[in-house]
From Swiss-Prot:
Cofactor note: Has some activity with cobalt but not with magnesium, calcium and zinc.
Top EC category: transferase
Source superkingdom: Eukaryota
GO BP: cell differentiation; negative regulation of Notch signaling pathway; nervous system development; pattern specification process; positive regulation of Notch signaling pathway; regulation of Notch signaling pathway
Cytoplasmic compartment segments: 1-6
Name under which the protein is recorded: Beta-1,3-N-acetylglucosaminyltransferase radical fringe
Gene3D superfamilies: 3.90.550.50
């Protein structure tokens, strides 16, 4: 009996020793939880990441503003632009025309570019000028390309402020569509008789639009060195539509709609007078619709300033030498 008791005691001691060892061992760590995954990018969302550095660095000379005009408009339209907003952005602005003009060349210098495109307002002539604009921008090395027409007033400060909220390395296509729905076009497939239907948004050139350098470089296979014109023939559309076709239809990027761009196609009198000076571009109706102008007062009558561009300019830059002194007073809006 005592022998059995001794065996049991030894067993108990051995068990106690094992338990003691187990208690001294470190507890196993729990398995690590899986790292949270970043949400998938939303294709419709405006990219906003890592913009602080670019905002602080964006300078006026980072922007390439292309003004499309024609020889017959050098007098009535272009001189007004040179007198107003271009005088505040001379190094940013490049004038693309279709005829030599020694007098204008003296005013604009090397910023005036004769595209040698046809002066007839056809789809092919418009695309010819856009092709030259694109190539000159790529050659310039600047960060942003902005296209406007010769009936646009550009507010350089508002433009720079808007572009500073984006990165030029990202795919940015910024402007205002003239339609409330995507355009539908027939895309002719090269090397065959087949065709496809494509739908895409485009920013109307009459209001102006901007492209980041990152996106413009991706457009190169369809836009550089004359390729733009052959691309336009695939859909048989004018220049601004072709830009939208390349960006949305071929590259899969998206137009970012902005209400700050304005063309003569909209009712400009509906633009609140208090918001006029914050817009990026303005326009006017012209002889066929002379009353379609922004509602802004000032020191010039409608007869003196039918486009209202001089009035807008003097409100933005009252120190301009030809602006009336009273324009520097209190309120100028109606």
């Amino acid at each position: 009996m005592s022998r059995v008791r001794r065996v049991l005691c030894r067993a108990c001691l051995a068990l106690a020793a094992v338990l003691a060892v187990l208690l001294l061992l470190p507890l196993p760590l729990p398995l690590p939880l899986p790292l949270p995954r970043a949400p998938a990018p939303d294709p419709g969302r405006v990219p906003t990441g890592s913009l602080t550095l670019e905002v602080s660095r964006l300078q006026p000379d980072d922007v390439f503003i292309a003004v499309k005009t024609t020889r017959k408009n050098h007098g009535p339209r272009l001189r007004l632009l040179l007198r107003t907003w271009i005088s505040r952005a001379p190094r940013q602005t490049f004038i693309f025309t279709d005829g030599d003009d020694p007098e204008l060349q003296l005013l604009a210098g090397s910023q005036m570019i004769n595209t040698n495109c046809s002066a007839v307002r056809t789809r092919q002539a418009l695309c010819c000028k856009m092709s030259v604009e694109y190539d000159k921008f790529i050659e310039s090395g600047r960060k942003w390309f902005c296209h406007v027409d010769d009936d646009n007033y550009v507010n350089p400060k508002s433009l720079l402020h808007l572009l500073s909220t984006f990165s030029s390395n990202q795919d940015i296509y910024l402007g205002r569509p003239s339609l409330d729905h995507p355009i539908e076009a027939t895309e002719r497939v090269q090397g065959g008789g087949t065709s496809n239907t494509v739908k895409f948004w485009f920013a109307t050139g009459g209001a102006g639009f901007c492209l980041s350098r990152g996106l413009a470089l991706k457009m190169s296979p369809w836009a550089s060195l004359g390729s733009f014109m052959s691309t336009a023939e695939r859909v048989r559309l004018p220049d601004d539509c072709t830009v939208g076709y390349i960006v949305e239809g071929l590259l899969g990027a998206r137009l970012l709609h902005s209400p700050l761009f304005h063309s003569h196609l909209e009712n400009l009198q509906k633009l609140p007078s208090g918001a006029v000076l914050q817009q990026v571009t303005l326009s006017y109706g012209g002889p066929e619709n002379p009353h379609n102008v922004v509602n802004v007062a000032g020191s010039f009558s409608i007869r003196q300033d039918p486009t209202r561009f001089q009035s807008v300019h003097c409100l933005l830059y009252p120190d301009t030498h030809w602006c009336p002194m009273k324009n520097r007073g209190k309120e100028a809006f109606q």
